[in-house]
């Protein structure tokens, strides 16, 4: 999207502005060769290239293109800045620990050449120290944070950056510099199933998704919990990679609620966007959450380890736990790179509180597979489910996977979509095939242990083990 802080500030400050994007080898080289995120980013870079060309043409600056590089961010940006003889480089803030280190390296490499680096807030409405308690401390509980966030919100915070007004400063890359977005193969990647999934990069695709969602937003507060229903916005990947600005989304939610005098759906969606900002400020103020419990006492929880734990983790990853809703959810993430939000909570709770496994193992699996992966939200979500987070569910609250299945997929539609081998089981039995009698199983063509696994854990017994595991930590807490 061109509603972008860094682009606006660069255009406003300079006579000539070149736009560049670096495919960072330090990120890409450790990824699997088929990675939906890389394909999405490449599509989005191509769309941005076309958007910039059109913007240039509208302002009598033909030949404006996105300059694309593939290498180390610090090396490529410094080299490009020298080649173009620029005085400053503009970019946006990113509080991911890797991004902070990368930006420091870029700043250093530019400083060696006498070039400034200016970075701006863009990825959130309010960042870092903008929402603090009365005593100047960061919030550790969501509800008061949300109240302060809403109180601080004003029209100015949500304005789109008026890039068009200053677009005449856009410059075409000099001859011989090279531009254009490299093919996926040139980046070392292969095509995924994004096209079949109808997931498209770029701001036009994002706007189309937003338009579609706004037709359904009034039902969001109820529909969002049912994975078989088209309830969510599906905009997470666009928000993650900046093809649609957070300002645009908050404006849409607020305007919709105002137009309807009130909309529980729009309010619930806005609340989710604020949760994202809450987790971003937690990451900024408490960077130890990467790798450690937000509440340090929970680092003492003794999770299962060893061969049996590794086998249980593999079964969870592959969707072979014997709990159909959990397994269908894992099939969804493995096949599409997306998982419904309710199911993110269910699968996380199952891993930690049914299987007794360390939440960091699940966090890493989601980080590798989710197309909309953001460190702060993923970490926050996992620590919420594991009861180790700043404002997590209580440690004694343990999701019952069967209750969740019957409540949120009552007819088994989602389960049937991802576990077709269970499709002929009745609505009452599909949630717990092990409870079906031999006649029902035979009629459905299901042999447990062959077509579908027996449960790898008994929920009632697992619940007792989890209560004991967390109680042990609570009882040794200093008073």
Question: Where are these predicted regions, by residue range?
Answer:
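Trp/Phe/Arg-rich N-terminal binding region typifying the photolyase-homology
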Residues: 1-157, 265, 377, 460, ...
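Alpha-helical packing segments of well-folded alpha/beta enzyme cores
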Residues: 6, 44, 48, 206-209, ...
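Generic alpha-helical segment signature
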Residues: 41, 203, 319-322
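Glycine/tryptophan-enriched, flexible segments
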Residues: 115, 136-298, 408-409, 413-479
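Active-site-proximal binding-pocket segments
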Residues: 230-421, 427
């Amino acid at each position: 999207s061109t509603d972008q802080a860094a682009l606006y500030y660069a255009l406003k400050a300079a006579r000539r502005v070149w736009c560049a994007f670096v495919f960072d080898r330090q990120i890409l080289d450790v990824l699997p060769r088929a990675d939906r995120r890389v394909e999405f980013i490449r599509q989005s870079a191509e769309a941005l290239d076309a958007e910039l060309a059109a913007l240039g043409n509208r302002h009598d600056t033909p030949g404006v293109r996105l300059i694309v590089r593939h290498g180390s961010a610090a090396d490529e940006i410094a080299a490009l800045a020298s080649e173009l003889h620029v005085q400053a480089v503009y970019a946006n803030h990113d509080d991911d620990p890797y991004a902070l280190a990368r930006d420091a390296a870029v700043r250093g490499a530019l400083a060696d050449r006498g070039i400034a680096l200016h970075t701006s807030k863009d990825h959130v409405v309010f960042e870092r120290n903008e929402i603090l308690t009365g005593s100047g401390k960061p919030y550790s509980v969501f509800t008061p944070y949300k109240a302060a966030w809403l109180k601080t919100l004003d029209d100015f915070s949500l304005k789109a950056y008026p890039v068009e007004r200053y677009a005449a400063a856009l410059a075409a890359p000099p001859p011989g510099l090279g531009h254009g977005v490299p093919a996926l193969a040139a980046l070392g990647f292969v095509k995924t199933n994004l096209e079949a999934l109808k997931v498209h990069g770029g701001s036009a695709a994002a706007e189309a998704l937003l338009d579609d969602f706004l037709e359904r937003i009034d039902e969001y507060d109820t529909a969002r919990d049912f994975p078989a229903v088209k309830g969510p916005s599906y905009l997470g990947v666009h928000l993650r990679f900046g093809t649609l600005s957070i300002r645009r989304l908050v404006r849409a939610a607020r305007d919709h609620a105002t137009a309807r005098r009130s909309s529980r759906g729009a309010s619930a969606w806005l609340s989710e966007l604020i949760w994202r900002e809450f987790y971003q400020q937690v990451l900024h103020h408490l960077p130890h959450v990467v790798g450690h419990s937000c509440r340090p006492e929970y680092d003492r929880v003794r999770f299962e380890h060893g061969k049996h734990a590794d086998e249980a983790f593999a079964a969870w990853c592959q969707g072979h736990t014997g709990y159909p809703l959990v397994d269908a959810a894992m099939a969804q993430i493995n096949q599409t790179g997306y998982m419904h939000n309710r199911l993110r909570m269910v699968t996380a709770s199952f891993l930690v509180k049914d299987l007794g496994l360390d939440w960091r193992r699940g966090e890493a699996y989601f980080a590798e597979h989710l197309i909309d992966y953001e460190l702060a939200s993923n970490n926050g979500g996992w620590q919420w489910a594991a009861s180790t987070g700043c404002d997590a569910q209580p440690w004694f609250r343990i999701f019952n996977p069967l209750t969740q299945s019957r409540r949120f997929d009552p007819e088994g539609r989602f389960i049937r979509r991802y576990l077709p081998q269970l499709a002929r089981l009745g609505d009452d039995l599909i949630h717990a095939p092990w409870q079906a009698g031999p006649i029902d199983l035979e009629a459905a063509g299901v042999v447990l242990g062959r077509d579908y696994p027996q449960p790898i854990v008994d929920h009632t017994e697992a619940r007792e083990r989890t209560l004991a595991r967390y109680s042990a930590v609570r009882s040794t807490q200093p008073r």
